A protein has these predicted regions:
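N-terminal amphipathic, basic-rich helices that act as targeting or association modules
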Residues: 1-80, 237-258, 274-277
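Structural signature of the thiamine diphosphate
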Residues: 217-285, 407-412, 432-481, 607-629
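A glycine-rich helix N-cap at a beta->alpha junction
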Residues: 86-96, 161-173, 196-199, 402-414
Length: 629
């Protein structure tokens, strides 16, 4: 096997060209086998095997800098840079990340995880290179999907004035060369992607400039060339911005890719190389359903079926069913996603109500203001979005939604710890940034049924900005007997005793139950409260608890700073209530990838860690009482 020769960086450069295609096939088999066991991003990685190999063959890494937009397609890059043996621990706690990480390898030039950032980061590296008078290539690889994000165009606009080399590889995995551009552009691509073309171009220009009126002749030729390209060539938009364009190029032809990369190095300025790849290439199940294999858990290689541990509905499933049910009755309900209809559960809505479904692409900022506009026009927009991606639209929430009191519902999926995708995807900041905004209401359900009730409340019984945050994974079906009607700003008493009160937000109620069970065995009196509303905090409930309890324990799966616990402390401080409060929350840090149970333990928000903290604080409360006697 040729793959056995690839054990350290640059081993690929020792291969002969006749070995390239076999290595690509072996890498695909390796990825399918490994990801079938660990889970991960499969379809996108199968699509860029040859592209990645060509980049490593054409450039001198790590001196040359390679940036992967989003970064989920960097698995082949990791294989070629000496990390092949780490794939058994892919995305596991303490194991290899599923994204580029500078602290994992110096071949990873820039950390990524969210979309549309690579051109900005690459341009920054170019400027650093030039100001330090250094000499290396900078290559940003960005997918066609990421080009739906406005940040990419902001960076392209900035890059258009560059006078030094910057290479942008556009990985287009949704189009076919023949279907979209035909034979003439393909022929012109072959011509434009050759050294002889650029030699001729430079020689003709230099000769003409020496002639009387040469400047005028060159300008005329450029205008004629531009008009011709406008009619028959793709990429005209980029060239209108002042960015050179090469392609389209077959992204599965390694030698042709290498040739184009060498041409691109010669261009003084920013250059786009349009590469066409096939998502899921080489594995029939991923080719047929690339969306399913974009991010997938362990699966059966033969059938392509995911090995799910349970068929119970997820929170996303619960949301999907309820919004469709409500939309049947209320035609003003519309749904918005930022390129995540599958993940957020809006696929069913898109089929049932296609005229009321809007996928705006990877454009969270636009999605929020677009939703605000629909709300201003009398509709009831629901923006379904992952917690970590909503961060990108903070200003739009504040400026375009909340200042105007517009009725936009934010359905925030993947709130809290999400696990294997790591720092960039943990949903642990939404409570902090949302509760800082005036006019925003924030709720968190204790189980799947309460999520349904909250969505109905938000759409039918409310008329201002409101967010519902819920976790990834299977919807909790316990505590169904506690189903008091939802009233604005009011918490729900679950179990009322005395001494110690556990006030839990959302899915932390499950942990609160486990903590109470253990503490009851030790003889403690424990109250459990379902916060329901993170903002506003139920101050009546807090007053009630302070009358019969000595210790209030807040519990949330969010960072402490700016979260639910701090709001509770602030209320007691404002009312001069000196009751002891213990905040259980995530630390002021980023949380790496790994199993959620492990991450909770490491972060101190699991059952045993909380019990230890509660007992220590309770001992302090009793000691304080003794000192005051």
């Amino acid at each position: 096997m040729i793959l056995e020769k690839i054990n350290k960086p640059n081993d690929i450069k020792q291969l002969s060209p006749i070995e390239y295609n076999q290595l690509a096939d072996e890498i695909r088999r390796f990825l399918i086998e490994k990801i079938s066991k660990t889970g991960g991003h499969l379809a996108s990685n199968l699509g860029v095997v040859e592209l990645t190999m060509a980049l490593h063959l054409a450039f001198n890494l790590p001196q040359d800098k390679l940036i992967w937009d989003v970064g989920h397609q960097s698995y082949t890059h990791k294989i070629l840079t000496g990390r092949k043996n780490q794939f058994d621990q892919l995305r596991k706690f303490g194991g290899m990340s599923g994204f580029p990480k500078r602290n994992e390898s110096h071949f990873d030039a820039f950390d990524t995880g969210h979309s549309s950032t690579s051109i900005s980061a690459g341009l920054g590296l170019v400027k650093a290179r030039d100001l330090k008078n250094e000499h290396y290539s900078v290559v940003s690889v960005i997918g066609d999907g990421a080009l739906t994000g406005g940040m990419a165009y902001e960076a392209l606009n900035n890059a258009s004035s560059l006078k030094t080399n910057f290479i942008i590889v556009l990985n287009d995995n949704t189009m076919s060369i023949a279907k979209n551009v035909g034979g003439v552009p393909h022929m012109l691509s072959n011509i434009r992607s050759s050294d002889s073309y650029y030699d001729l171009k430079e020689n003709v220009a230099n000769t003409l400039y020496k002639l009387p009126g040469g400047d005028h002749i060159v300008d005329k030729i450029k205008k004629t060339k531009s008009n011709l390209k406008q009619m028959i060539l793709p990429g005209q938009m980029f060239e209108c911005m002042g960015i050179s364009y090469l392609g389209p190029v077959n992204g599965h032809d390694i030698e042709k890719l290498i040739k184009v990369f060498h041409v691109a190095k010669r261009i003084n300025g920013a250059v786009i190389i349009h590469v066409v790849t096939h998502k899921g290439h080489g594995y029939k199940h991923a080719e047929r359903n690339p969306a399913k294999f974009h991010g997938i858990g362990p699966f059966d290689i033969i059938t392509g079926k995911e090995l799910k541990s349970s068929d119970k509905p997820t929170y996303s499933d619960v949301f999907s069913e309820k919004i469709c049910q409500l939309a049947k009755k209320d035609k003003s309900i519309v749904a918005v996603t930022a390129a995540m209809p599958d993940g957020t559960g809006l696929n069913k809505f898109s089929k049932w109500f296609p005229d009321r479904f809007f996928d705006v692409g990877i454009a969270e900022e636009h999605a929020v203001t677009f939703s605000a506009g629909m709300a201003a026009g009398g509709l009831k927009p629901v923006f379904a979005v992952y917690s970590s991606f909503l961060q990108r639209a903070y200003d739009q929430i504040l400026h375009d939604v909340c200042i105007q009191h517009l009725h936009v519902v934010f359905a925030i999926d993947r709130a809290g710890l999400v696990g294997s995708d790591g720092e960039t995807h943990q949903g642990i900041f939404d409570l902090s940034f949302l509760t800082s905004i005036p006019n925003m209401t924030v709720m968190a359900p204790k189980n799947g049924s309460e999520l349904s009730e909250m969505l109905e409340f938000a759409l039918l019984n409310f008329n201002s900005p409101i967010a519902i945050r819920y976790p990834r994974g299977q919807a909790y079906d316990g505590l169904e007997e506690y189903n008091a009607p939802i009233r604005y700003g009011k918490a729900e008493m679950i179990i009322e005793e005395s001494d110690i009160a556990l006030v839990a937000a959302g899915n932390m109620l499950i942990t609160a139950q486990a903590v109470r069970d253990k503490l009851k065995e030790k003889g403690y009196n424990i109250t459990i409260v379902n916060a329901r509303f993170i903002k506003p905090v139920d101050t009546d409930m807090l007053d009630r608890l302070s009358e019969s309890h000595r210790l209030i324990v807040t519990m949330e799966e969010n960072v402490l700073s700016g979260g639910f616990g701090e709001a509770v402390c602030q209320y007691y401080d404002d009312t001069c209530n000196d009751i002891d409060v213990l905040n259980i929350a995530l630390p002021d840090d980023y949380v790496e990838h790994g199993n959620v149970d492990i991450l909770r333990r490491e972060s101190g928000v699991d059952r045993d860690s909380i019990i230890e903290k509660v007992l220590n604080r309770w001992a302090n409360v009793l000691n304080k009482d003794k000192r005051n006697e």
